[in-house]
Amino acid sequence: MTRVLITGFAPFGGERVNPSWQAASLVAAEPPAGLAVTAAELPCVFGESLDALRDAIRADNPDLVLCLGQAGGRPGVTVERVGINVDDARIPDNAGGQPIDEPVVPDGPAAYFSTLPVKACVAAMREAGVPAAVSNTAGTFVCNHVAYGLGHLIATEFPHLRGGFAHVPWAPEQVPDGTAPALPPATVAHGLRALLAAAARTPAEQDLKVTEGATH
């Protein structure tokens, strides 16, 4: 049975909830067939988030890791193609830290690509009826910090792992006036189950050869 670690973040930026953790918890409570899923909540703090991720990987010894974060304003689940080696925080993290133009890992490579089949994951979510897309930027806040940091952990400490990052939209309770896109965490979790099933059966090098690019 494939062992999966799925992570979400604590609320940040004045929010009372974080839909990434809500969805991760739902997936762990009702995992896809053939997968053993454990969920871990990461602090929305530079540095500490990667320490918590490393500890969770060591504790659970997963085969596959999916880290989640909140991307308010995006209309669907977006699977990140790449994490880049820069922290450039527009707002402080939950500990008050606000690094500007600092590397996630000093002297690390410029970027790490996801080792999940990002296009197959997107296709699986769409087939499950959940809006999804490939994203080419995870931002430069703690989400990208973890997306890049996970790639570095895989490259340097856990070479048996495959892993990647996905962003989820706001939950409806975060936009009660309906002025921005939102998805219920249960809907997101339904899509993530399809994503994980696709990731477990599809090596990254056998990803779908379909267009999911962007012109800008």
Swiss-Prot record:
The gene is pcp. Belongs to the peptidase C15 family. It comes from Streptomyces coelicolor (strain ATCC BAA-471 / A3(2) / M145). CDD domains: Peptidase_C15. The active site is at residues 80, 143, 167. It comes from the Bacteria. Keywords: Cytoplasm, Hydrolase, Protease, Thiol protease. InterPro entries: Peptidase_C15, Peptidase_C15-like, Peptidase_C15-like_sf, PGP-I_bact-type, PGPEP1_Cys_AS, PGPEP1_Glu_AS. This is Pyrrolidone-carboxylate peptidase.
